[in-house]
Amino acid sequence: ADGDFDLWAKAVSYFRGRLDAEGLAGKVELVGPDAAIWGPEEAWWVSRSRDELGDRIGLYDIHTYPSKCTVNSGEYTRILEAYRREVPAGKKIVMGEIGFKFVEPADSLLQAENLRRAAAHPNASTDDSQMFVYDPMYGTDMADALFQTIHAGYSGCIAWMLDDTMHFKEAPDKLKIWGFWNIFGDEIFGAGEERVRPWYYAWSLLCRTLRPGSDFFAADVRGAAGVKAVAA
């Protein structure tokens, strides 16, 4: 809908009606508003979805690509809470996509390095790649973001993304490098690209530990600056 809420809401209402007409009422729920946000200012996407679409939305979600400084400072929690507050009672909200983009001035050196690495890589999209997936730092930052997502009251989170070969941008051989690996490394892009990247270990450990159906509790860490925690 390219930011047009009215157009999107009209499509949702039509699609919900078609599902119900096919006997799928109560069997298939719609997720929305699926908005990509950068700060708390876009929380109206959730509030308007709540007020104008009602039960046509079964599960709420947003996408976020925060800057490293936003997450590490804890500001990320406050941004997410603005959206959670707009979710109606009895409904849940999940993070439909999460990854890091160095969009804040404080992270300008990281962005410069990200662009340098992408330009030097023969198969990286220079417009849409996160080249720090090769660094352990990205794993700890993604864990930090997940903990804050939990603390903000979200019920699920999907990492962007599984495999580099899912998407390309400027050309078919210019991949959006964001994945845990590149499954076609050995065949096309170089055997080293199939190697599991460091952030996979952080994310997979959390997936195995924070099980579906768990109850989560806020954890206040004192005396250890920079350490984040969650209790389940």
Regions found by a protein language model. Name each.
Residues A1-D4, W8, L24, G58, ...:
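Residue-level signal for functionally critical sites in structured catalytic/ligand-binding pockets
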